[in-house]
Amino acid sequence: MSFRNPILSLAAVLVFVSLLVPQQSAAQNSTNAYMIDEGWAKLPNGRMMGAVGKAKVDPDGRHIWAVIRCDAGQDRFGSECLDSDLDPVLKFDPDGNVVESFGSGLFIWPHGIDVDSDGNVWVTDAVSDNNIPAGDDRGHHVIKFSSTGEVLMILGTPGEQGDGPNNFTSPSDVAIASNGDVFIADGHNANGNNRVVKYNSRGEYLMSWGGTGYAPGEFRALHAIAIDPDGRVFVGDRSKSRIQIFDQEGNHSATWTQ
């Protein structure tokens, strides 16, 4: 995941920083002053920290969920979990200890994550088609897990890219609305589907919007998606270096640029 268009809560951004950069302090103008805690995340059994796809705060407000790619080697970029037995979905307590992990063998390139109000964890696999071995039924899908790792739902057709209602092409991210509706950023590649796909809480297709381009409502590489407390849908449009804002029916309301 690129950090050029972060559509994340402040807490999740702080987790990224604490995992990836040296210790330093930052003065704040608000009462919520904070300091970076170097080495906060403690991976078990000597595991090396791979790339962090995304992090989210648990509904309890204390724990942090993160997608951490399995292999820390730079030469594996794009397929870090292809042949790994490591879990890419990890839950950390406030002290940075892993208290839950799962997802081994289910992803090739886990990318986005969200946690719904019931504590279920949603994870996307944004692997590109040329990184999926022949016959492998992973990639181009989104998995809903219980908080203990039980697979509850799969959206998309694993291992098969496409642009229909039951297919994605390298879905980058997922966001769950307060009513349970599911919004998928589809997807990671600039020349891919470039759309937002919406499902209800049962996984039934409702609608999609977008298309490849630079006009309002069009995208070039959707890289992140989030929903604010007012229900607005924020989409990180990476190749255009902008954030587009929509209502939940796909109506464009604003664009933020760098």
What are these regions (language model features)?
Residues 24-258:
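Eukaryotic scaffold repeat domains enriched in small/polar residues
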Residues 9-19:
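Bacterial N-terminal signal peptides
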